Structures are given as structure tokens and as C-alpha cells.
């Protein structure tokens, strides 16, 4: 018994969900990676033509190759759903790539040949995309949300410890077909409430196990102190494993191993299976 108890305290490593849908389902990733790929192709083809026509800055070629590496690196991280742990590396690579693309744009934009001017335009586009990525991956959650909304996404986990959005609604906590749970329902301390207030009681529900009601296992990515003004919120410890009812909205209805019920911010946890 003691052995199994100790093992339960050690969080298992996260499962990598390799799928191209991780990009397709993320509007920010889809838009920015597509634009970056098109800009890179423009720069690459124009640079080949310019090099054939005459002298071409040698350092620009290294910048083009490095930018391709950055784009592929980001795409792979999205495919394996592993962006969060690599944000610091992403920011470092983007800073280097931005230096190369801006230098290439400065070297080519004043040329009198159309091929070099086209390559300069591609380099300028890549520089702009790199700056957007730097802003998105290198700042806190509030700024990341502002950038993501340009592409139609409502937020993403930042590298720094995120701050949950406290303006949640009942639909953020439960499915649209589920009534919002009051504080008393979550704690089990509500008094004087008719058992039929939330629909007819079905005794068969009592026979369901906790795993039936909370089928999704998650793990806390960061420590989180619940808002003392909201008794619904749960405090989390980094690495803590517990169950959630579903993954809809920004706040998930959860049940800890101690049996405590409440809600937790979705950007503080990751699903395990």
C-alpha cells in the first residue's frame, strides 16, 4: 500500500499528442506559420534569381537557412503539442532570426534590381512575423491574448506563469447543457435547498464512481493560490494530479484526490489522458 501511495505522488510524464490538427485547430499557429512559409518561399526564390543575376550578400543565405529552421522548429513543436516547455528556446531563436532578416532587408532594399527588391520584401515580412512571434511567445498572458485575438484565438499558455482570467461565466465552467454549480453545491454545505431544484434526483447517479463524473486526468503546471473571495476556486500545487469533468471553457470543474470539488484555470493544467 505504501509503495502504491508513493507512486501516485510522482506525476507521470505528459503524453505527446502528435497530430497536424494541433496546428489546424490553432488559428494563431495556422495564420502565422502559413504567412511565414509564404514569405520564406518568396525570399528564397528571389534570392536564387538575384544570385544568378549578379553579386548577392553571402550572409543573407545563412539568414534564410536559419529562418527555415525556426519555422520548422515551431511547426514540429505544435505538431507534438509541446510548445509550452520550449518557449525560452523559441524566443532565443527568434531573436537571432530577426537580426538576420532585418540585416538582409537592409542590404537588399536599396538595390536597383527587381529580384533583390523582392527578396527584401520577403525579408521584411519575415522580420514582422518574427517580431509578432517574439511578442507572443515572450510576454505574459495578457499580451499573448492580444496578439492571438488578431488571428481569432482567445489565448494560449505563455512561458511565464499565467494569470487566470477571473471574468469566467457558467459556460466556462460547465458544458452549455449543464447548470452552473453554486458554491454550496461544490462544497456540499448548501442548506435549505430542495433536492428537485436542479432537476429530478436519480438514485442511479449515486452508484457512479468519481471517475465516471470526472473522467479526464490532468496535472498542474504551476502553483496556484485560489482567490479567497471565490470559494469555488481550488488551490493547486505544481505537479499535482487530479480529475476534471470536461475541458470546455477557461475554467474547468475539478475534483482533487482528497475529494475536494471546485474549479481551476485551464491554463494552469495539462491533460494526461
Curated annotation (Swiss-Prot):
Keywords assigned: Cell membrane, Glycoprotein, Membrane, SH3 domain, Stress response, Transmembrane, Transmembrane helix
Subunit structure: Forms homooligomers.
Protein's UniProt name: High osmolarity signaling protein SHO1
Family: Belongs to the SHO1 family.
GO terms, biological process: regulation of actin filament polymerization
CDD domains attached to this UniProt entry: SH3_Sho1p (cd11855)
Glycosylation sites noted in the Swiss-Prot or TrEMBL record: 112
GO cellular component: plasma membrane
SH3 domain: residues covered: 213-273
